Swiss-Prot record:
Cited InterPro entries: Euk_RNA-bind_prot, Nucleotide-bd_a/b_plait_sf, RBD_domain_sf, RRM_dom
GO CC field: cytoplasm; nucleus; prospore membrane
Name recorded for this polypeptide: Meiotically up-regulated gene 28 protein
Domain of life: Eukaryota
Gene Ontology MF term list: RNA binding
Transmembrane segments: none
Length: 609
């Protein structure tokens, strides 16, 4: 056989498993590839096109060869339409023969007769050829292991609450179609399985929707490699998706576009985590219960059972008000015999990539977080610190009653917008206008408004401003990242913004309690006692010297002076009297020869005693 012409550049495509090959015989000798291309083009796209020639029997006088062709369509529907329309039709004077490609009978007989010889022979090429022919000639209906999910389908699927409706049928293999027709089901594509919710068929319970998340872990097979196999229940075959982990149930009203990337890109969506959820609660019941208190976008329940025989669930709401209302309504409340614990889920760094690769969920991370989001309106407890005590004095116990903790009452706490931030200590050399301030905070999320305070006349920055985010999580991340950071020559202060009146009220509530008067510490006087005595603290001021001597029994220090000083004192008085008789110019230590000589005998008398 000689190949006349290969596929044109327009229709040249790679071979696919879902391609269907048909045989076109009895073509006229004058037929060109372009004519055959125009004949089969209305029935659909075909990836391969081969026109071949075969010489007739030697007994025939005609020397014109017989032409035939093989055409490979992309789907079975196009091949069926081409066979039904062109088989037996007239084309340039010849009656066409259009049918599915099959192996010639003589090759089948050779195969059947030589099976045993091939199995027992040592010819590796024969075994390989036999395996290829055997694979080609097996039955049309595949086995369970052959029905795979198509990985190259790009069609989208729509979902109804009670059943699944396939809006655009995918292009699948003929064997898969045959299996779908035999079982009354449809083959889903990889994208459909990853995003579409497959219903769980149960008799006693309502139809819940369960999603099998896509796992990209190296140790766990992904959804694209997962088999779809039929399982029989009450003589009815359904598609069952085998998975390496437990599924998570989701409410029927969940939209298909609400994936982790969609949740992250739309900051108006809040996710509430629910702990201690009873096992008997379904997503539909939880959705109906919470929908009375706000607009619910979706509900997801993790089917892995905790140690306390409860489930973990998440609820997606559209507004911050609905989120707070649901938490105030159901937090720490008994629900179906269990105390629910609700919290606002806080995203972590690498939110999108971590959630898309997480093996336990696709809507959000279905594991309870380690820490809760701090409330923006909490006021830290300020404790009064006492000074270090004097090691020589044991203070009385009544002073410890003054050391109290100032805790503001909840009624005096003003409400603070969790999205609005106040920034001060901005360096003018780095942030000089509103645009630069917005660029500084834009990496944390979408900014609704941004203002930098400046002087009207000179437009010089005052060093503080306000930034309003669209989501509280973004504001929390900005505070945790920039507060206290050395920015230029100054250290930034980033916190929640509040009105000046509210700030005064909050500060007055903290410092409203008057502190007791400070008791002055007494001056310590260590007496000259012969025996050590225990000193006790007293509030009286030090007594005069005479009372102190009488109280403690001390003697007058003058009584202990030696008797030999009496004569010295008499000599001193005589010297003073003799000094008064001197001239006025010689008094009071005026340097004079007579004054010097008059003091010399006195000095000698004192030293000689």
């Amino acid at each position: 056989m000689i190949a006349l012409e290969k596929l044109s550049e327009k229709n040249k495509r790679s071979t696919k498993k879902c391609e269907i090959s048909i045989y076109v015989g009895n073509l006229p000798s004058t037929c060109q590839s372009s004519d055959l291309h125009e004949l089969f083009e209305p029935f659909g796209n075909f990836s391969k096109f081969h026109m071949l020639s075969r010489k007739k029997n030697k007994s025939t006088d005609s020397k014109s060869p017989t032409l035939f062709a093989f055409i490979t369509f992309e789907n079975k529907c196009s091949a069926d339409n081409a066979i039904a329309s062109l088989n037996g039709s007239s084309f340039q004077g010849n009656t066409l023969k259009v049918e599915y490609t099959h192996i010639v009978e003589r090759y089948k007989n050779k195969l059947e007769n030589g099976v045993d010889q091939i199995h027992h022979s040592n010819n590796e090429k024969a075994k390989i050829r036999f395996s290829k022919i055997e694979k080609y000639t097996k039955e049309t209906r595949p086995t369970v292991s052959e029905v795979r999910v198509s990985t190259k389908d790009k069609k989208e699927y729509s979902m109804n609450t009670s059943n699944l409706v396939q809006s655009n049928p995918p292009k699948v293999h003929d064997k898969e179609n045959a299996f779908a027709e035999a079982t009354g089901t449809s083959i889903l594509s990889s994208k459909a399985v990853q995003t579409l919710l497959v219903s769980d068929f149960t008799e006693n319970e309502p139809k819940h929707l369960s999603i099998r998340p896509n796992c990209k872990d190296n140790n766990t097979p992904s959804i694209s490699n997962t088999f779809i196999e039929p399982y029989k229940e009450n003589n009815t075959e359904h598609l069952h998706l085998k998975s390496a982990f437990e599924p998570c149930q989701m409410m029927p009203g969940m939209l298909l576009e609400q994936n982790p990337q969609f949740l992250y890109d739309n900051p108006s969506i809040f996710v509430i985590g629910i702990l201690n959820l009873p096992l008997k609660v379904s997503p539909v019941e939880l959705y109906n219960e919470f929908s009375n208190h706000g607009h619910i976008l979706g509900v997801a329940i993790n089917q892995s059972i905790n140690e306390d025989m409860t489930h973990y669930a998440e609820v997606a709401v559209s507004t911050y008000e609905s989120c707070i209302e649901i938490i105030e309504k159901f937090h720490a409340i008994a629900y179906e015999g269990s105390i629910l614990q609700l919290f606002i889920k806080q995203p972590v760094q690498g939110f999108c990539s971590n959630l898309l690769n997480h093996p336990e969920g696709t809507m959000t991370n279905l594991l309870p977080p380690n820490m809760e989001m701090p409330q923006p309106f909490e006021i830290p407890v300020i404790a009064k610190t006492s000074a270090l005590p004097n090691p020589f004095i044991s203070f009385p116990s009544f002073q410890t009653s003054y050391e109290t903790t100032v805790t503001p009452t909840p009624t005096s706490t003003p409400t603070i917008d969790p999205c609005n931030l106040f920034v001060k200590n901005l360096d003018d050399n780095i942030v000089g206008n509103t645009q630069q301030l917005e660029e500084l905070f834009s990496k944390f999320g979408r900014i609704k408004s941004c203002t930098l305070a400046s002087y009207p006349s000179t437009e010089i920055s005052k060093g503080y401003g306000f930034v309003s985010f669209s989501h509280p999580f973004e504001a929390v991340q900005a505070i945790n990242t920039l507060n206290g950071v050395l920015f230029g020559k100054k250290r930034l202060f980033v916190n929640y913004a509040e009105k000046r009146e509210d700030r005064k009220k909050r500060l007055s509530a903290i410092f409203s309690q008057s502190y007791p008067p400070v008791v002055p510490s007494p001056s310590l006087t260590i007496p000259m006692a012969t025996e050590p005595q225990i000193l006790e603290y007293h509030q009286e001021w030090p007594q005069p010297l005479i009372q102190s001597i009488q109280q403690h029994g001390y003697s007058d220090p003058r009584q202990t002076l030696p008797t030999r000083l009496d004569s010295c004192a008499a000599k001193l008085r005589e010297a003073v009297i003799s000094n008064e008789n001197l001239n006025p110019s010689h008094k009071f230590g005026i340097k004079h020869s007579t004054f010097k000589t008059s003091l010399s005998p006195l000095t000698n008398i004192v030293l000689n005693q």
